[in-house]
Amino acid sequence: MANIGDEKVSQLIPTLGDDKIDMIAATSVLQIRASEIRQTQINWQSYLQGQMITQRDHDFIVNLDQRGQKDLPDKNPDACADVFLNLLTHISKDHTIQYILVLIDDILSEDKSRVKIFRETKYSGNIWQPFLNLLNRQDEFVQHMTARIIAKLACWHPQLMDKSDLHFYLSWLKDQLKMNNNDYIQSVARCLQMMLRVDEYRFAFLSVDGISTLLSILASRVNFQVQYQLVFCLWVLTFNPLLAEKMNKFNAIPILADILSDSVKEKVTRIVLAVFRNLIEKPQDQQVAKEHCIAMVQCKVLKQLSILEQKRSDDEDIMNDVEFLNERLQASVQDLSSFDQYATEVKSGRLEWSPVHKSAKFWRENAARLNERGQELLRTLVHLLEKSHDPVVLAVACYDVGEYVRHYPRGKHIIEQLGGKQRVMYLLSHDDPNVRYEALLAVQKLMVHNWEYLGKQLEKEQIDKQAGTVVGAKA
């Protein structure tokens, strides 16, 4: 996607969010159900007779709903907000609540400026509360149509949503994303696409562990539409420089690189490239931007860019981003030291037997550098020993721990403090023979104190072994 300044993002995203995405939403579960509910009729008179609503509320809703007075909300905004909030508070029947919510959503969709009817009302209570209460209802349509309305009220008015209400709402959306087989997941993602265009809401989403949730779902298999929507959310988040700098701490680049590699839909490719571009352009700390470039190289993004270059898409945004990324990643490769390469590989969590691991020169020159930034790389290695299920990753991590101990005088003590020795010993009984072998070597290195003495002993054993072979041959 072509480079878009932060000042323009608020103009771009509403268009993408409201027009193009609503065309997709028309076939979503929420919209199909909403179109069915519009065809029903509510007997408002029965609610009046049962004294569940007032005469004023009855007359207003009948004039709006049954007598076609569509301009009523604009003519009498205070009454409109008051009536709808009263109805949501005093009526309990799911079917009627569904209908009221569809009416409210239609009113807002017809004219965005109508959000001020609810946001600037003289309603005595907290206007968010009637809506937030509905998120706890059992009826799924009620929950998700309410969530859609809340997003519009929160995004289409300059006054921000209150922090406590915002925290509750974003936590609810996050939990809905994590729910297995959620038929309304497109609607949930749609709400986030709207909310995350507001900078203050982006940080609130970070505080409820939202970014890691997005990425954990993207790391699993989801359909391409949800994939697009969730990557879109990441794209919006990366317009904030601080969030762009944090993004790869959540392992975003490897996950997005996998999506790019597997993508068969052009719009998914386009949005992933746009995120990658922001991860390079938006961070104010150029060291972070450099690390992002190296991480992309490590995750084989250059190969995918080459494939896209050969395909020559008609999409100008894609080709612009391919050209930009190619240029920046190629430049980062030229400046890449062996330690940069190693550090990026460790941070990616995708260890493989690349040349640096087996290079004695590398370990002599760089073992001490594993202590930099609060022993960040060592901590990552120990974390991989504990959490990874990939035998190659485990074997390489064991080897690296052993080489660090071998080449850094206080290495044994530091690894023990970080819990690395215990993890390596645990892997002595791993199912994979290569993991067991590398774990055994690492344990031996952890146990030995005098490397010079060990080297001489190994050399002596080798000489004795060769001498024995010669004597045996003569005999």
UniProtKB/Swiss-Prot annotation:
InterPro entries: ARM-like, ARM-type_fold, ATPase_V1-cplx_hsu, ATPase_V1-cplx_hsu_C, ATPase_V1-cplx_hsu_C_sf. Pfam families: V-ATPase_H_C, V-ATPase_H_N. The keyword Ion transport applies. Belongs to the V-ATPase H subunit family. This is V-type proton ATPase subunit H. One of its GO terms (molecular function) is proton-transporting ATPase activity, rotational mechanism. Subunit of the V1 complex of vacuolar(H+)-ATPase (V-ATPase), a multisubunit enzyme composed of a peripheral complex (V1) that hydrolyzes ATP and a membrane integral complex (V0) that translocates protons. V-ATPase is responsible for acidifying and maintaining the pH of intracellular compartments and in some cell types, is targeted to the plasma membrane, where it is responsible for acidifying the extracellular environment. Subunit H is essential for V-ATPase activity, but not for the assembly of the complex. GO terms for cellular component: lysosomal membrane; vacuolar proton-transporting V-type ATPase, V1 domain. It comes from Manduca sexta (Tobacco hawkmoth). Keywords: Hydrogen ion transport, Ion transport, Transport. It comes from the Eukaryota. V-ATPase is a heteromultimeric enzyme made up of two complexes: the ATP-hydrolytic V1 complex and the proton translocation V0 complex. The V1 complex consists of three catalytic AB heterodimers that form a heterohexamer, three peripheral stalks each consisting of EG heterodimers, one central rotor including subunits D and F, and the regulatory subunits C and H. The proton translocation complex V0 consists of the proton transport subunit a, a ring of proteolipid subunits c9c'', rotary subunit d, subunits e and f, and the accessory subunits VhaAC45 and ATP6AP2.
